[in-house]
């Protein structure tokens, strides 16, 4: 019997987290601030990258850490090089209180 074999679950944004991010993305696109996005998944985190245009590096990455060292590092906004610009234990709070134009 193979019942002891665990199928590794691919970790990702939860459905409600993705909705929060995509709602923000749609708003920023309609304002002309963002033009494109990308998703990256590793064993440690998933990130949603936003681009001003396709030829450039990502402006920002909205990241979710699967096993953060402390709960305030669960959700991050980083720049292209991975420097943490903002962090929170709550995604909605993190994004709602962000002034994107002033972030860099």
Where are these regions (language model features)?
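Local beta-strand/beta-hairpin segments that build beta-sheet-rich folds
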Residues: 57-60, 85
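Negatively charged, low-complexity tracts enriched in Asp/Glu with abundant Ser/Thr
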Residues: 1-46
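Mixed-charge, glycine-accented linear interaction segment located at domain edges/termini
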Residues: 71, 75-103
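Short, charged/polar low-complexity linear motifs in solvent-exposed/disordered segments
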Residues: 54, 103-104
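Short aromatic-glycine-(Arg/Gly/Cys) micro-motifs in beta-strand/loop hairpins
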Residues: 1-2, 60-81
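Hydrophobic residues embedded in beta-strands of well-ordered beta-sheets
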Residues: 46-48, 75
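Short, charged/polar surface micro-motifs in flexible loops or helix N-caps
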Residues: 43-46, 53-58
């Amino acid at each position: 019997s193979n019942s002891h074999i665990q199928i590794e679950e691919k970790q990702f944004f939860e459905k409600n987290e993705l909705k929060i991010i995509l709602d923000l993305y749609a708003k920023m696109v309609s304002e002309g601030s963002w033009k494109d996005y990308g998703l990256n998944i590793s064993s440690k985190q998933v990130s949603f990258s936003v681009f001003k245009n396709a030829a450039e590096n990502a402006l920002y990455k909205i990241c979710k850490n699967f096993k953060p060292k402390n709960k305030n590092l669960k959700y991050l906004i980083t720049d292209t090089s991975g420097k943490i610009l903002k962090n929170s234990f709550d995604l909605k709070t993190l994004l709602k209180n962000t002034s994107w134009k002033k972030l860099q």
